[in-house]
Amino acid sequence: MKVNLDRNSSGFCIGVQGTIHVAEEKLRAEIGLYSLGDVVHNEVEVKRLESLGLVTIDDQAFRELRDAPVLIRAHGEPPSTYETARANNLEVTDTTCPVVAKLQRTARQLHLLGYQVIIYGKPVHPEVIGINGHAANSAVIIKHADLSDPAETAPLDLSRKTALISQTTMDVPGFYQLKENLETLFRNAGNPQEGPWTEVRDIDITLGLTGMQPTAPHVYKDTICRQVSSRNSKLHDFALSNDCIIFVAGKKSSNGQVLYNICRDANPRSYFIEDTGDLDEGWLKEANGSPVGSVGICGATSTPMWLLEKVARHIESLER
């Protein structure tokens, strides 16, 4: 049985790499450090960092904390978090992913331009909560690109000028499907002659804020991280090239669920685990009991490479 470890499209994305590196540097310096929420959506990695001294706290504990160092993770935070930190004299180490920080700025500027902001994303995801905060908590959040949930579309004002953006880890096809469905929804509610929504650039937003250029009534900006989305096709091909796939990710990982489904669609013999203890040796065998020819080990943007290597070594040891 050949064990293939995917090093090209698995493991931490750049944003998470930065957060983990900063956390480790702080902890190595023996500086006490609190993390507002799980530093990454991978329980195994969180436990490793907690063993080094990281303390994970929730929103309530954060509001009660005083005079202490706090890490802002890659997902980012709403403005209210920073206001609380200043009021409580907290030393903030901000590791918000640069892609997310840019998206937060876009959401804030679109809101200032008077747009009704729509976020394609998951309402309870910390990144979306942060983005919405930068739009004064007024954004309409839509998870289902087919507009199948009436509760998601109920807050929409179809007479307002509107801007569509996205959580950075959502799927690209879904974003453009949502755009088309929103175009139809708004067209049917108002002007039947209205054309496609306008793609808005950073320069367009800047010119709009300065009053140098009028803004289109309905705009969209594809804010999905291409480093994340480019993994989709690569993992699809990786899953096809192996007899069996062991996908390693945390159960809380939104990106992990998306990538696992891609693997499973390409190869039905794809299995989701958090750590080696979840592995069923029967997955690695053919119907006649012989080992599969190859097993691929891959994971999410929140899965550390050391954990993928651990799983690969464990599987290799089963043949000895």
From Swiss-Prot:
(2E)-4-hydroxy-3-methylbut-2-enyl diphosphate binds at H41, H75, H125, T168, S253, S254, N255, S302. Its EC number is 1.17.7.4. It comes from the Bacteria. It catalyses: isopentenyl diphosphate + 2 oxidized [2Fe-2S]-[ferredoxin] + H2O = (2E)-4-hydroxy-3-methylbut-2-enyl diphosphate + 2 reduced [2Fe-2S]-[ferredoxin] + 2 H(+); dimethylallyl diphosphate + 2 oxidized [2Fe-2S]-[ferredoxin] + H2O = (2E)-4-hydroxy-3-methylbut-2-enyl diphosphate + 2 reduced [2Fe-2S]-[ferredoxin] + 2 H(+). Isopentenyl diphosphate binds at H41, H75, H125, S253, S254, N255, S302. One of its GO terms (biological process) is dimethylallyl diphosphate biosynthetic process. GO terms for molecular function: 4 iron, 4 sulfur cluster binding; 4-hydroxy-3-methylbut-2-enyl diphosphate reductase activity; metal ion binding. Dimethylallyl diphosphate binds at H41, H75, H125, S253, S254, N255, S302. Binds 1 [4Fe-4S] cluster per subunit. The active site is at E127. It is an enzyme of class 1 (oxidoreductase). Pathway: Isoprenoid biosynthesis; dimethylallyl diphosphate biosynthesis; dimethylallyl diphosphate from (2E)-4-hydroxy-3-methylbutenyl diphosphate: step 1/1; Isoprenoid biosynthesis; isopentenyl diphosphate biosynthesis via DXP pathway; isopentenyl diphosphate from 1-deoxy-D-xylulose 5-phosphate: step 6/6. Keywords: 4Fe-4S, Iron, Iron-sulfur, Isoprene biosynthesis, Metal-binding, Oxidoreductase. Its cofactor is [4Fe-4S] cluster. [4Fe-4S] cluster binds at C13, C97, C225. Catalyzes the conversion of 1-hydroxy-2-methyl-2-(E)-butenyl 4-diphosphate (HMBPP) into a mixture of isopentenyl diphosphate (IPP) and dimethylallyl diphosphate (DMAPP). Acts in the terminal step of the DOXP/MEP pathway for isoprenoid precursor biosynthesis. Belongs to the IspH family. This is 4-hydroxy-3-methylbut-2-enyl diphosphate reductase. It comes from Chlorobium luteolum (strain DSM 273 / BCRC 81028 / 2530).
